[in-house]
Design a protein with these regions (language model features):
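N-terminal active-site wall of soluble small-molecule enzyme domains
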Residues: 35, 39-104
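Glycine-rich phosphate-binding active-site loops on the catalytic face of alpha/beta enzymes
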Residues: 88-96, 136-148, 191-213
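Hydrophobic faces of well-ordered beta-strands that scaffold small-molecule active sites
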Residues: 4-10, 33-35, 56, 64-68, ...
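C-terminal helical cap(s) of enzyme catalytic domains, especially alpha/beta-barrels
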Residues: 189, 203-233
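Structural motif
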Residues: 28, 59, 83, 108, ...
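Glycine/Thr-rich beta-alpha phosphate-binding loop at enzyme active sites
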Residues: 39-47, 51, 118, 128-162, ...
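Catalytic cores of alpha/beta
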Residues: 21-22, 72-82, 119-132, 178-196
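Conserved, mostly hydrophobic/aromatic
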Residues: 18, 25, 36, 80, ...
């Protein structure tokens, strides 16, 4: 059984407080930082980019969880200077050469993750299983923060978890991205999720401090050995 992981979505961060935010993340033992890369083509929005990843690595030792919402990622992987052990998610729908792309990520030292949109069946991963570190299940349509959970995705998570177990991959990670709120995260955990992308409805919720939100999410997803920290206002 994988240890639950919390991945703050930097699409939701207040960039004017980046240094303070990263300090809190380090103090709280955040597992990885979720970086959404959007090209305005695969999704109708632009976000972050290659230089952002490079600069971020200079500011914190926390590893990155790079989510490539871009067309033809197989032609652009070299732009991201992927570091050993970093998670890199590519969409099933983004390239006709998905197996080659996953292999290229692994060759660079990354941990390949296959991302699937809400309407994409989970079993498209069948022949890729030996090469994957995990599956990223989009629980909203990709492209924008603040959307509501697609209700059918909870059943999709249950079906995917059963599929992985039945095929001999019980330790493959299941990452969830989209409206991973305090309430939804518990349902997602019960459905089989192990990695949780926290955005405006959890980690960056305005109703409490950043550290308080993180501690609350840790409790929800079952992450143990939590340090009790003074709230950072």
């Amino acid at each position: 059984m994988n240890t639950p992981k919390l991945l703050p979505s930097l699409m939701c961060v207040d960039f004017s407080r980046m240094a303070q935010t990263l300090e809190v993340f380090e103090q709280c033992g955040i597992d990885a930082l979720h970086v959404d890369i959007m090209d305005g083509e695969f999704v109708p929005n632009y976000a972050l980019g290659t230089d952002f990843c490079r600069q971020l690595r200079k500011l914190t030792p926390i590893p990155l969880d790079i989510h490539l919402m871009i067309s033809r990622p197989d032609t652009k992987l070299s732009c991201f200077a992927i570091k050993p052990g970093e998670y890199v998610s590519v969409h099933w729908e983004s390239t006709p050469h998905i197996h080659r792309t996953i292999g290229a990520i692994a060759a660079l030292g990354g941990k390949p993750m296959l991302a699937i949109n809400p309407a994409t069946p989970y079993d498209v991963i069948r022949y890729l299983l030996p090469d994957l570190a995990g599956v990223l299940v989009m629980t909203v349509d990709p492209g924008f923060a603040g959307q509501q959970l697609v209700p059918a995705m909870l059943q999709k998570l249950r079906d995917l978890r059963a599929f992985l177990d039945e095929n001999g991959y019980p330790d493959l990670e299941i990452e969830v991205d989209g409206n991973v709120s305090f309430e939804n995260a518990e349902k997602m955990r019960q459905a089989g999720a192990t990695m949780f992308v926290g955005g405006s409805s959890s980690v960056f919720w305005k109703g409490a401090s950043l550290s308080e939100n993180i501690q609350r999410m840790y409790a929800v997803i079952g992450k143990r050995n939590i340090a009790v920290l003074q709230a950072v206002k």
